């Protein structure tokens, strides 16, 4: 069973989520794994669909929400690795990012997973930024 999303195409069920691998999204050059979380048996939830629509229409605002946490990941990395470019402000990170995945619950509850061009090739880590109640106060490093 599949659900056809108007932007993402065919989504497959995974537990209670609806997912797509390597989706082309209108707001980023990367092909992205996307999960619209906590759906029903036949389709993603209305709140997850609305959340994805909001993210797609407001990607610059999403970047603003997560950029301070991204900079907190960047600073110790830049201090430890001499080849990492030196950025003075959080907004300078954009353009060095690759969107890996999105997990969307609603307009103000979602996670964004990124990898950055300046990360060393031997570094397997991806960084997930958590937006909860419209605020990003945490991130985690996976890999």
Where are these regions (language model features)?
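Long, contiguous N-terminal structural blocks used for assembly/anchoring
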Residues: 1-84
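Acidic, proline/glycine-rich low-complexity IDRs
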Residues: 1-25, 89-143
């Amino acid at each position: 069973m599949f659900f056809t999303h108007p932007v993402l195409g065919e989504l497959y069920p995974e537990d209670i989520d609806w997912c797509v691998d390597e989706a082309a999204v209108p707001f980023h050059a990367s092909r992205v794994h996307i999960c619209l979380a906590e759906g029903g048996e036949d389709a993603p939830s209305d709140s997850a669909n609305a959340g994805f629509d909001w993210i797609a229409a407001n990607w610059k605002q999403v970047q603003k929400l997560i950029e301070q946490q991204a900079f907190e990941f960047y600073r110790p990395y830049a201090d430890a690795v001499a080849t990492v470019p030196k950025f003075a402000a959080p907004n300078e990170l954009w353009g060095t990012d690759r969107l890996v995945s999105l997990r969307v619950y609603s307009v103000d509850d979602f996670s964004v997973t990124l990898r950055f061009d300046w990360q060393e090739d031997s570094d397997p880590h991806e960084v997930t930024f958590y937006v909860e109640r419209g605020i990003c106060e945490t991130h985690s490093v996976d890999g």
